[in-house]
């Protein structure tokens, strides 16, 4: 987890400068000098350039997939009312987009309702104008980073085993859950995500030091 610290710090710094990477995923992260760093800012944009994010959202909406690294609120925010109804209907009639099954698994890992329920809730919030556009855009990268590790262990039983086996994993997964909340108003901020990540790192590094000290005492 220590290797991921620059990713959380980078998230915080980008947010402070109102820059959205807009494409955080495994192939856009490299290992450099023992830590992970972001690369490929080809889809990045300034928070103020709303049309940039609108076009990216509509491009994905016109495809046949759910871009799994994007939150549903971003994918659907700029859709027409009839298009929103169509998306719900697609899932109801089993003509869902590619990756819908993955979305379902991720929500199960975090103890949430099905992907359909999440989409229905987001659609209702968009229709009722309950989602703030700026808050939604600021939440894109937070969601993308939060979903990374659970996706690496895609099979749900592997994720469940990891969480049951370790308090450390369980606490980090709780942070990932906050980062991937379906509604942007409930999603943790980049600054708070970094703060909580650092707190967890410090907590478990101290525990490791104590364990090492105890082992040395036993040997002596």
Q: Language model features by range: what are they?
A:
Residues 3-4:
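Activation segment signature within eukaryotic-like protein kinase domains
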Residues 7-14:
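Conserved hydrophobic alpha-helix
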Residues 15-32:
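Catalytic-loop of the protein kinase fold
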Residues 37, 41-160:
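C-lobe/activation-segment region of protein kinase-like
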Residues 167-181:
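Conserved C-terminal C-lobe helix
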Residues 182-208:
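Terminal C-lobe "cap" of eukaryotic-type protein kinase domains
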Residues 205-220:
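Regulatory extensions appended to serine/threonine kinase catalytic cores
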């Amino acid at each position: 987890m220590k290797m991921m610290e620059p990713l959380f710090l980078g998230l915080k710094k980008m947010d402070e400068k109102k820059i959205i990477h807009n494409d955080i995923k495994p192939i856009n992260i490299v290992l450099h000098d023992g830590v992970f760093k972001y690369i490929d800012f080809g889809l990045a944009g300034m928070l103020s350039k709303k049309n940039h994010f609108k076009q990216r959202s509509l491009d994905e909406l016109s495809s046949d997939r759910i871009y799994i690294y994007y939150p549903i609120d971003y994918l659907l925010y700029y859709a027409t009312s009839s298009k929103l109804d169509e998306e719900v209907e697609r899932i109801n009639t089993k003509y869902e987009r590619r990756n819908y099954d993955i979305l379902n698994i991720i929500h199960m890992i975090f103890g949430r309702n099905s992907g359909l329920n999440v989409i229905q809730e987001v659609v209702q919030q968009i229709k009722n104008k309950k989602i703030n556009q700026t808050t939604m855009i600021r939440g894109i990268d937070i969601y993308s980073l939060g979903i990374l590790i659970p996706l690496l262990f895609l099979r749900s039983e592997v994720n469940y085993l990891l969480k049951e086996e370790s308090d450390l994993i369980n606490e980090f997964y709780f942070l990932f859950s906050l980062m991937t909340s379906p509604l942007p108003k409930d999603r943790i901020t980049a600054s708070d995500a970094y703060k909580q990540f650092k707190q967890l790192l410090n907590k478990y590094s101290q525990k490791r030091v104590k364990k090492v000290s105890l082992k040395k005492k036993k040997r002596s």
